[in-house]
Each structure stands twice: as C-alpha cells, then as structure tokens.
Amino acid sequence: MARRIRKSLFANPFKSALRALTQAAVKATRQAVTKASRKAVRQLTKPARRAAKPMARKVAKPAAMRRNKPTAAGASAGTNAGAGASTRGVALGPSGARRYLLFKPPGARKAAPLPLLVMLHGCAQDANAFAASTRMNRLAATEGFLVIWPEQEKLANSQGCWNWFDTRSGRAFKEAASIIAAIDQVCARHGADPARVAVAGLSAGASLAALLATRYPERFKAVAMHSGIAPGTAQSAATALAAMQGRRAPAALPVTLAGGGDAPSLPPLLVVHGSADAIVRPGNGHAAAQVWADASGALAGAPRTVQRGQRYLVTVTDFKRNGRIAASLCEVAGLAHAWSGGAASQPYSDAKGPDASRMVWAFALRQFRADA
C-alpha cells in the first residue's frame, strides 16, 4: 500500500504536466495550421484576381475592335490610330518566300491609289531596324505614301545581306524578281499606284535597288542608292568585297531586262554617299552616278555645296540630259557607312548628316510629278 501511495504521489504531477504539454502542443499546431492555411489562401487568390482582369478585358471587347501592338516600324511613325498602321505580309517569288513589312498612312483605304516607296535594308539589319533608323514611316504618315520593307531571309544569306552581287549564278536576279512579286502584291491588295513606285536602299539594299532599276526600268519612277555599289561592278562574293574597297568599277551599266526587248529609259538615280565610308568606299558613289549618267547620255553640271545648320556639308553634282536629271550625286562630308540624318540610337545611322529620308522622298516626288 505504501508503494501505491508513493506511485500516485509521483504519477499525478507527471500526468498533469504531460496533459498540459499536450494541450499546449495541440494549440500551437492549430495556430500554425490556421496561419499557414490563411497564407496559402491569400497566395492562391491573388493570382486569380490578377488573371481575371485581362480576361475580362478580352471578353468585353470584340477581337475586331482590339488594336494590335504596333511594331517598331509602326512606332517610328507614332502609335496612335492617326499615325497609320504597319502590317506583315509574305510574297512568293523565284527566290522563295520573302516577308515584308508594309506601312499605310492614315486614310490609306479611303483615299485614291497612293505612291509606293520600296525600302531595302542593309546587311545585319531587318525591316524593323531599317524603319527605326530611317524613320521613313513618320514621313510617309505626313506625306501620304505607302512604304514596303522587304526582308532578306537568313537562310539565303547568313548576314542578312541581299545577294545583289551574285549575277553569275542568277541568284541576284531571282531576289530582284521576288521584290517585284512583293510590289505586285501590295499594288493589288493595298491600293498602291503601280505608276508611282520608287525604290531605295542602304548598302547591300542600295545595290539591289539599282539592280532592280536596270532589270525592271519600266516599273520605277526613281531609284535611290545610299552607300551602295552600281550593277556590273561585281559578279561574286569575292569581287563584291573588292568592289567595296574601291578596287573595281563597272565599265558600263548592264541593263539586262527581265522580259527581254529594247531597254526603256532608266529611272533617275539619287546617290548619297559619305566621304568617311570605310566599308563601301566613296569612289563607289562617284562610279554609280557616272555610269548611270553615261547610260542615259547625261552630262555633269557644276558641283554646289549645301549645309543646313550644324549638319554635315553636302556637295551635290547633277547629271542632266535635255534639262532633266538622270543622276544626282550627294557627297556627305564626314559621313561614315550610315544612313544620313537617321535615328541616333540605331546602328548604321548618323543623326548629324542631312536627312536622307527627306532627300529620297523629295527626289521621288519630283519624278512622280514630272511624269504625271
């Protein structure tokens, strides 16, 4: 009996302490579970509320009324509806499918057929980059013309260059024909006036622009070369590199019509070239203007200088026949291999030069009006 009494004396305090610890543990566990549950609920409900907002906007607004995000090319002209719109397209030609970006100024669908300017980018560029550099869409929005930006495929050239030089294999001619296919598509679907088409380009794009004008002279009213090389100067990649360094010059302009027959008059040519261009030597600009003038029977006039504000000085030489310009050479002092007057934030672009985009459009517009 004494053992039972001693056992109960020790057991009762132990049981009480154990019961107290158990109750405290249960209470703490419940509190922890409750706190964790509340936190989990908050984490689950917050994303649901955030996801519900854009979903509600999509349901509330029909797809036909939603505005697509502007591309970089569209943004260069402004992102509001009054600044025009950029759309993508694909044209099939002898060189395969070629994508393009098309800029339409405000009211393009309601207006009469509009002039079309074809802009061909240089190496290491695409349509968006070239549009951002030149800001031609902004000018098109105010002046009222369409701009098509064809894009070279990397499978055709790993550097994104147009293969303007590869006439030996015929690849250059196929790419030129694919550009024509894109122009035809834009004229048929988007209201471009086939009688008012001009083509311009930078570097490799300038060289392809000139090739287009010699293959399809009846399709263009004007052509502009910025830092490019004249057709007939190169026939392969090796000779193209030599031409870029000024070690080759065309003896005569090869006018090889895609459809055969007699050659019509070449469209007037604008050449813009920088005196500090170390990639495509300045002599190429001289050669392009001279060979074009020779093919047109035009003679050079006296050079004149033009400078606006703090921009680079320009020396202009016009080549005329019967009072009409066949070629105009604009040599920009201090300009390297870059679009003159382009956006300062873009590569291959120099904001200190005269505005080449305005020069190109003004030149094309004069030809449109002269032939109206």
Model-derived segments and their meaning:
Residues 152, 224-233:
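Active-site nucleophile loop of the alpha/beta-hydrolase fold
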Residues 271-273, 277:
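Short beta-strand/loop motif that positions the catalytic acidic residue
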Residues 1-116, 128-134, 142, 146, ...:
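A domain-start/cap signature at the N-terminus of enzymes
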Residues 206-218:
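Short glycine-enriched nucleophile-adjacent loop
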Residues 114, 122-126, 335:
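Active-site glycine-rich loops that stabilize anionic/oxyanionic intermediates
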